[in-house]
Amino acid sequence: MSKIIIWNEYLHEIENKDVADLYPHGIHGCIKEFLAKDSSLIIETATLREEHNGISENKLKDCDVLIWWGHKAHDEVLEETVNLVQRRVLEGMGLLVLHSGHHSKIFKRLMGTNCNLTWREYGEKERLWICNPGHPICAGLDPYFELEMEEMYGEP
């Protein structure tokens, strides 16, 4: 069994009715609902406004993968939270950063850059390589997969 934690700011869903209509249980709830189809996964959620941003040493202890969705409140994430997540990533926990998470404190710290980016929208095919095929979250995946119509991102 793999333990996955889905972290979300959970602000857009509270502040914007259109987003709330799309994600009545939050983006984290939508991702959890999809992943829950796999009975071999233990899935928990955490959000920005929870105590300690919903992240504790105990919660991360057995976590195999942390999915991180951030967009507009990166600066509100506590340094304590970033330190805990960084330590667990360095110990082997997987981190999947979604959407505008490239500007999250944890992603910038792990990448060692400001993570500013440039992009183009030409509908090109993107190939994503599995870097750690032995990680439980990668079980059953081919060495890579392709997305047919994607935006391309790069660091300037």
Map each language-model feature to its residues.
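Glycine-rich, phosphate-binding/catalytic loops in enzymes
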Residues: 22-24, 82-86, 107, 112-114
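Conserved short-loop catalytic and cofactor-binding motifs
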Residues: 15, 19, 73, 125
